[in-house]
């Protein structure tokens, strides 16, 4: 059995977890930085300072809760990209320091791969499988062929989906982060009321675009003073629009997999926006694959997914040098 200490500091969550190869989570510590809420978005400098302030304490807490000593660990893993460079440096340097002192292997984890692989901690998912990764910073379709081996089928050409949710929420006078609020208000709204553009729909490929939808909401919001019901209707219409676009793109992704003679049984929806139950249920209803998603606490950024990815990589002897430099941009299909 292998056991890994994992660190996640790529954005505004400071997180530490201890995970083993028996699929046990021995500790899961996470601190979300509430300072960003009043700023309406993530401020990199604030995020970096918070990581520096809290990371050591979270590591200490995780070790105490797991009843382990550093000598009991088999490796140290950290998210080393993509993400905000300040946070990546802090988390990666801490992991390297622990690895050096304890003489344990260091594993640099790609944040996107961690989102893609965490379902294998929870379910029996075999390679290859289709991935829709939707988060605050990324939106892309992938075929996961193996650990470290991915085919990117398409991605957003402008805003990420999480960014679109947050900007629409801001337009409607809602607080940050906007995703959970939009989903909640949409339950009381009429999703057919406002006609929003379905960008890229019916086109070939799997690329996406959300800037036009964001602009359409802004233009409609300028036309009249919105009541509470108007806001609910707009939230519902926005979600309907997004679900139509994703459904169209998923069908194209399945078609591409077939054309490549890659047999897909599982479709994984992951990333922070995958916490949106409306979108997941809509896709499950219309896609003839085994549709899986992590629970909400493992959709948003966390160290459990980093630890599990570290386990997957350690089992294949994929370890990294202490000279490894954090990568603010690090595409999955260019993993090595």
Curated annotation (Swiss-Prot):
Binds 1 Fe(2+) ion per subunit. One of its GO terms (cellular component) is cytoplasm. CDD domains: ASKHA_NBD_TsaD_bac. Its EC number is 2.3.1.234. Keywords: Acyltransferase, Cytoplasm, Iron, Metal-binding, Transferase, tRNA processing. It is an enzyme of class 2 (transferase). Its cofactor is Fe(2+). Pfam families: TsaD. The keyword Iron applies. GO terms for molecular function: iron ion binding; N(6)-L-threonylcarbamoyladenine synthase activity. It is found in: Cytoplasm. Substrate binds at residues 133-137, 166, 179, 276. InterPro entries: ATPase_NBD, Gcp-like_dom, KAE1/TsaD, TsaD. It catalyses: L-threonylcarbamoyladenylate + adenosine(37) in tRNA = N(6)-L-threonylcarbamoyladenosine(37) in tRNA + AMP + H(+). One of its GO terms (biological process) is tRNA threonylcarbamoyladenosine modification. Fe cation binds at residues 111, 115, 301. Belongs to the KAE1 / TsaD family. Required for the formation of a threonylcarbamoyl group on adenosine at position 37 (t(6)A37) in tRNAs that read codons beginning with adenine. Is involved in the transfer of the threonylcarbamoyl moiety of threonylcarbamoyl-AMP (TC-AMP) to the N6 group of A37, together with TsaE and TsaB. TsaD likely plays a direct catalytic role in this reaction. This is tRNA N6-adenosine threonylcarbamoyltransferase. It comes from Wolbachia pipientis subsp. Culex pipiens (strain wPip).
């Amino acid at each position: 059995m292998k056991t890994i200490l994992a660190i996640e500091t790529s954005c505004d969550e400071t997180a530490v977890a201890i995970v083993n190869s028996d699929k046990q989570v021995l500790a899961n510590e996470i601190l979300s930085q509430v300072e960003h809420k009043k700023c309406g978005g993530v401020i990199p400098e604030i995020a970096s300072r918070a990581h520096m302030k809290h990371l050591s304490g979270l590591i200490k807490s995780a070790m105490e809760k797991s009843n382990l000593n550093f000598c009991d660990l088999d490796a140290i893993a950290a998210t080393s990209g993509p993400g905000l460079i300040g946070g990546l440096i802090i988390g990666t340097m801490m992991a390297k320091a622990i690895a050096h002192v304890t003489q344990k292997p260091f594993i640099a984890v790609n944040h996107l791969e961690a989102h893609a692989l965490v379902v294998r901690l929870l379910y029996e998912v075999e390679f290859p499988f289709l991935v829709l990764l939707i988060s605050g910073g990324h939106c892309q379709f992938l075929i996961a062929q193996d650990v470290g081996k991915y085919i990117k089928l398409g991605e957003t050409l402008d805003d990420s989906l999480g960014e679109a949710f947050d900007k629409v929420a801001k337009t409607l006078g809602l607080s940050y982060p906007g995703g959970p609020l939009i989903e909640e208000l949409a339950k009381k709204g009429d999703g057919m009321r406002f006609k929003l553009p379905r960008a890229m729909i019916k086109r070939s490929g799997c690329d996406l675009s959300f800037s036009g939808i964001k602009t359409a909401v802004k233009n409609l919001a300028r036309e009249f003073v919105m009541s509470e019901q108007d806001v609910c209707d707009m939230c519902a219409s926005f979600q309907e629009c997004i679900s139509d676009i994703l459904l169209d793109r998923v069908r194209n992704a399945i078609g591409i997999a077939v054309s490549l003679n890659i047999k897909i049984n599982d479709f994984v929806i992951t990333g922070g926006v995958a916490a949106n139950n409306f979108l997941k249920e809509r896709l499950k209803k219309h896609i003839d694959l085994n549709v899986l998603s992590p629970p909400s606490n493992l959709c948003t950024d966390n160290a459990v997914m980093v630890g599990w990815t570290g386990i997957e990589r350690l089992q294949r002897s994929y370890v990294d040098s202490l000279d490894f430099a954090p990568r603010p941009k690090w595409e999955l299909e260019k993993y090595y």
